[in-house]
């Protein structure tokens, strides 16, 4: 035994040595590439191909999540769920979707880099670490984010100086992105994220704020905000139209797209189903004692390119460039609700065959000879679904307008329709006055007037009623001209909190009135849950009954203990029994999603002073009961969500909001006015005579000119009684368009060219000279000069050419999803799918239709025909064979009968049998008998 120990020890040592070397080799093979790769990524020595691989993998992850969402929505049978309807109503137009997708690909790429570089090292991601500039550029370019992070190219033409760009870009020549569509919302205070960069407050329910957890937003709704419909107090001063105008104008200046995907990237969690916080899913948790699901679906707003997790690697590390949200619209009061905020949407909205510069109208439905909004072209959202069982309304498409939310409620669609009619009325009249104008000039001049009327009605008639005269004077004040240092970009707190004060003024009923402004006998009042989406506008009386109801019905008064009616908190977007949504909880959750600082921070911002105790809150809201409920939920004034805090304040004198929202709304309206180079009062935008005519106009006059109402209130926002408060339309001042008459100067040397195919020509004058400005429609590129000065010698001007852009050749930003193939069309492109896949609602992604390919169906049909044919042929052959067999048997029988012995005699000598069958021989063979011989022979198988 003693002799075996050394031997065993030696053997064990050799084994351990071999094992150690093996482990070292394995570790070297496994870890060395990682450390080298990490070093390369961190210190800029990685090849571009590896970075592109990360981006491409991230693209597949994001597109997979998007495709899952599209497939889920397309496969939905029956009525959509409330959360699907909400996502449909927030579906951005294609340009915004492309920007949102690019931002999510970039975010996923940076996440992947973080995981690869730091995750395998077993340590957290330090915000102070940055990626090399070359790597950042590669990610930004490959993801598609780079073009949306750079200043746009501003055209230097007479036309660009005369009319605003459809995107809002280049309004400020020194800051061309200010107020432009698809740029980040402005921050007036640094955001408040739980991790300092991206995660919302409340993402981790165990995190405490001032020693207290944040209350679930649904609990805030239940205990503070919700009020039964029957308990609503009506406004004795202002009409429902004031509320609807506020919603309409909100949709003119702000739209924040949700995440392009409704599923967690890489994790596969569906935001419609999961109750976990897995970006972009941020579900609204329900109380444990609530029946039904444990949460309400909620998707985060898409991040702007280069912000949040992606932004931590960019520029200013002291602020870490936290997550920002995108505004898909122009910030300006420019009637983008009518004309859109992108060239692609503007192209869809215009009637390109008219010489008057008209907008498209509905060709299937008319309202007593007046136009309706056109329908969206397929593929269109499935959201605009009628009530089940309603005859003649199945499959009504959504309306197409400058904003995708035009179809949400009939009252909102009514205002969109009103302004569509007003544009076409103005464009036709202006073209009649100026026969030499091109269609584009008539369109642009009418658009300019409609935009000015939006500005006048909002700043002159709407905002002072909301803020009250004193707060309006304090925060907005008189117009003193264009201020190029004023940033007009809509702020996050305005769009996400302050301007949502209008939700507290929504009446639970939509009322439709007859010509005497009485309840319409055939059109009873509708609860909001029965009034979503557009078909009632088409099938139930058109605009006039709705507008009568808006003019003569009071709005809901925003009473402190009646903040929001239960039509919005309990039955939002309900079309069936598939659940509900809660608008109040959505507003609170959206504020946290956007990183809005709390109520106290904004009070300090507006000079109102911070609150520290329950008693101070009670004093600020002047309501002990309400203050007690809020403090019981939040624990400390610092924790109160800004939207709730602003709503809880008592109304200012002759106002419909408290001091905080008056400050925030007033500040934003002043920025929208003073920071807009094309504001209607700005020098050079209109002539003095034109400004005087515009100042005479009103919303009441617009209603007179575009509906069948013979009389209206002088102030459309003042709740009015019929007939004493109504004026005949002939007494309501309107525009005298003669001041827009433009006579060509005598001896004008400009020879107008023939119409420019797929483009427009505008005669423009500036600095004492006249020029021709050429532009191409969306999808075409100008080849030749943009602008040509008129020659003193006269003569025809040779126009440039508009060439089609082949979007399908853009490999860096393919217009179609990888699941689809791109086909170039004149002025655009078309995404096509291989059967049985079909295009999803985004128009670019192919999803499974749930059926067999058409070719397979044809093959199956042909196969069935072939099988049936073969079966028939086989049956025919069998029948013929059987028939032939029977005939053969009969022939044998007949033959046997003729060769049989006479009756009474058997075969052979015994005569005992009358059988026709010959006697069997040995082994069962028949024995033939030769009648001529006494001898016999054996026959094989057949008679002789």
From Swiss-Prot:
List the protein's name.
Answer: Thyroid peroxidase
Keyword Transcription regulation part of the UniProt annotation: no
Q: Which InterPro entries does its entry note?
A: EGF-like_Ca-bd_dom (IPR001881), EGF-like_dom (IPR000742), EGF-type_Asp/Asn_hydroxyl_site (IPR000152), EGF_Ca-bd_CS (IPR018097), Haem_peroxidase_animal (IPR019791), Haem_peroxidase_sf (IPR010255), Haem_peroxidase_sf_animal (IPR037120), NOTCH1_EGF-like (IPR049883)
Binding positions for Ca(2+)? 252, 330, 332, 334, 336
Q: EGF-like domain location, by residue? A: 804-847
Q: What membrane topology term does the record carry? A: Single-pass type I membrane protein
* Gene this chain is encoded by: TPO
Cofactors named for this entry: Ca(2+); heme b
Signal peptide span: 1-30
Query: Extracellular topology: which positions?
Result: 31-858
**Self-association and partners:** Interacts with DUOX1, DUOX2 and CYBA.
Q: Which residues are glycosylated?
A: 141, 316, 351, 623
- Which pathway does it take part in? Hormone biosynthesis; thyroid hormone biosynthesis
């Amino acid at each position: 035994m003693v002799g075996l120990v050394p031997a065993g020890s030696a053997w064990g040592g050799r084994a351990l040595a071999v094992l150690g070397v093996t482990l070292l080799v394995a570790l070297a093979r496994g870890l060395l590439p990682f450390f080298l790769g990490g070093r390369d990524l961190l210190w800029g020595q990685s090849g571009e191909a590896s970075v592109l691989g990360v981006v491409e993998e991230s693209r597949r992850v994001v597109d997979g999540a998007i495709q899952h969402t599209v497939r889920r929505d397309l496969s939905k049978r029956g009525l959509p769920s409330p959360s699907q309807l909400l996502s449909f109503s927030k579906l951005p137009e294609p340009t915004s979707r492309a920007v949102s997708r690019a931002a999510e690909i970039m975010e996923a790429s940076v996440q992947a880099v973080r995981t690869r570089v730091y995750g395998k090292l077993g340590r957290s991601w330090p915000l102070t670490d940055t990626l090399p500039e070359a790597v950042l550029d590669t990610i930004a370019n490959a993801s598609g984010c780079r073009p949306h992070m750079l200043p746009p190219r501003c055209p230097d033409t007479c036309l660009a100086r005369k009319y605003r760009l459809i995107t809002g870009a280049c309004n400020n020549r020194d800051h061309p992105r200010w107020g432009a569509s698809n740029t980040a919302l402005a921050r007036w205070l640094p955001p408040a994220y739980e991790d300092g960069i991206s995660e919302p407050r409340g993402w981790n329910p165990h995190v405490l704020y001032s020693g207290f957890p944040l209350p679930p937003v649904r609990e805030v709704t239940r205990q503070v905000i919700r009020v039964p419909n029957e308990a609503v107090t009506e406004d004795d001063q202002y009409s429902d139209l004031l509320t609807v105008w506020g919603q309409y104008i909100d949709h003119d200046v702000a739209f924040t797209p949700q995440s392009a995907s409704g599923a967690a990237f890489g994790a596969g969690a569906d935001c419609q189903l999961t109750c976990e916080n897995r970006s972009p899913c941020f579900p609204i948790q329900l109380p444990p004692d609530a029946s039904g699901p444990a949460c309400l679906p909620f998707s985060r707003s898409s991040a702007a390119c280069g912000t949040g997790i992606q932004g931590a690697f960019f520029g200013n590390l002291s602020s870490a460039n936290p997550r920002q949200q995108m505004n898909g619209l122009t910030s300006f009061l420019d009637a983008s609700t009518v004309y859109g905020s992108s060239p692609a949407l503007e192209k869809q909205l215009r009637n390109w065959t008219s010489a008057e510069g008209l907008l498209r109208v509905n060709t299937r439905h008319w309202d007593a000879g007046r136009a309706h909004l056109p329908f969206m072209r397929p593929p269109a959202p499935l959201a605009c679904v009628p009530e089940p069982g309603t005859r003649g309304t199945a499959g009504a498409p959504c309306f197409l307008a400058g904003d995708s939310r035009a179809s949400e409620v009939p009252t909102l669609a009514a205002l969109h329709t009103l302004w569509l009619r007003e544009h076409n009325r103005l464009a036709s009249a202006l073209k009649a006055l100026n026969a030499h104008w091109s269609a584009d000039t008539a369109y642009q001049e009418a658009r300019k007037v409609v935009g000015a009327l939006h500005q006048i009605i909002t700043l002159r008639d709407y905002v002072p009623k909301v803020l009250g005269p004193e707060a309006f004077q304090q925060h907005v004040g008189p117009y003193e001209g264009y201020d190029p240092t004023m940033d007009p970009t809509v702020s996050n707190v305005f769009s996400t909190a302050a301007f949502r004060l209008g939700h507290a003024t929504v009446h639970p009923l939509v009322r439709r009135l007859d010509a005497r402004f009485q309840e319409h006998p055939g059109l009873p009042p509708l609860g909001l849950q029965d009034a979503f989406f557009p078909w009632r506008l088409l099938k139930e009386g058109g605009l006039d009954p709705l507008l009568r109801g808006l003019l003569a019905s009071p709005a809901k008064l925003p009473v402190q203990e009646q903040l929001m009616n239960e039509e919005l908190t309990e039955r939002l977007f309900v079309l069936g029994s598939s659940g509900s949504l809660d608008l109040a909880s959505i507003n609170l959750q959206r504020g946290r999603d956007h990183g809005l600082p709390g109520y106290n921070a904004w009070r300090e911002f507006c000079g109102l002073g911070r609150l520290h105790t329950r008693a101070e809150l009670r004093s600020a809201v002047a309501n002990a009961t309400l203050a007690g409920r809020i403090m019981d939920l939040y624990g400390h004034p610092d924790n109160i969500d800004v939207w709730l805090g602003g709503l809880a304040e008592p109304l200012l004198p002759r106002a419909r909001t408290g001091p905080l929202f008056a400050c925030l709304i007033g500040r934003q309206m002043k920025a929208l006015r003073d920071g807009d180079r094309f504001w209607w009062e700005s020098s050079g935008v209109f002539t003095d005579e034109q400004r005087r005519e515009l100042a005479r106009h009103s919303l009441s006059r617009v209603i007179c000119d575009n509906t069948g109402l013979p009389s209206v209130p002088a102030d459309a926002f003042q709740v009015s009684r019929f007939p004493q408060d109504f004026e005949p339309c002939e007494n309501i001042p309107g525009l005298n368009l003669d001041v827009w008459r433009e006579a060509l100067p005598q001896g004008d040397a400009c020879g107008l060219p023939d119409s420019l195919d797929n483009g427009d020509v505008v005669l423009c004058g500036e600095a004492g000279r006249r020029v021709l400005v050429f532009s191409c429609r969306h999808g075409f590129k100008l080849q030749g000069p943009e602008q040509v000065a008129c020659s003193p010698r006269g003569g025809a001007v040779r126009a440039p050419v508009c060439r089609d852009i082949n979007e399908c050749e853009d490999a860096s930003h393919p217009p179609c999803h990888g699941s689809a193939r791109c086909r170039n069309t004149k002025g655009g492109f078309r995404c096509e799918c291989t059967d049985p896949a079909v295009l999803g609602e985004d128009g670019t992604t192919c999803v499974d239709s749930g059926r067999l390919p058409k070719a397979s169906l044809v093959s199956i049909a042909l196969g069935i025909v072939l099988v049936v044919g073969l079966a028939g042929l086989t049956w025919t052959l069998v029948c013929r064979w059987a028939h032939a067999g029977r005939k053969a048997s009969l022939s044998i029988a007949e033959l046997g009968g003729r060769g049989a012995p006479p009756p009474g005699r058997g075969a052979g000598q015994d005569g005992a049998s009358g059988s026709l069958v010959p006697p069997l021989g040995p082994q069962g063979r028949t024995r033939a008998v030769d009648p001529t011989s006494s001898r016999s022979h054996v026959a094989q198988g057949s008679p002789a």
